[in-house]
């Protein structure tokens, strides 16, 4: 039995894509521990794997379990017991020698690595094998001894790009470089909107996260707006605004709907609604160009041979582009370095000018 854990839910269609492609690649009976099982059921993951709820239970302050876990944390300096109590459904039935794949991908790029480490130690104590699957890790994080200690415990690490691979190999010899599993995700072709221009659409993905990671969110938003204006005014292409994450509080549709409203009187622009990851890839694959913020939206484009520009904020976007093209210059625009709204448009012009060679 293959166990997949640290899955946040399929309303992040990148997470959904990782699960679908991983289960297909491994071709083994699989169990998915999900932090949002209802969303996985909505998008049909129960048809390919057994879904278990990874419920995080928070006990009232000064309850018995709270006192026990607080005492252990005070004495040992670790939160292992607290996490074991909170994540009972995940940790109660671990069988020795079973394989547990940590599928968060970029979980180590965000806060909360102490919880990840505690979950991993609890699994390892029961004799299971740990795999960090398709990951990206900012090299500077490896200056943190606690993160290094955690990563050393994995029996296998598959890094999805060379920047992370080169860093992780220095601390865990069981590190290999393997493409993100979502490159193998099949696409599902739905009927296209009536105003879809065959082989002449620019797919655009934007996210609240990319606005937050820029130096100024308004500059990032205006960069998207200026790009759309450029396409409508100076090309004969249509524009398809395509979401890839629809989580509460981090929903691409909120940004995309705002952009759509500014141009909705032009029949060459459309807003694609929410779909599962295979259906979204079906739309992306039929674009002529793609400009995206979400990693797995851009992976859908890359793997469909669609010339792609990434507005990125982390090591994963730079590393994947470097592995595909030899360098990330012109293929990735780091949002942190975006100073003027027209920079995104300038990068898109380069993409159009190099369409055939890409």
Predicted regions located by residue number:
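Active-site anion-handling motifs in enzyme catalytic cores
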Residues: 1-358
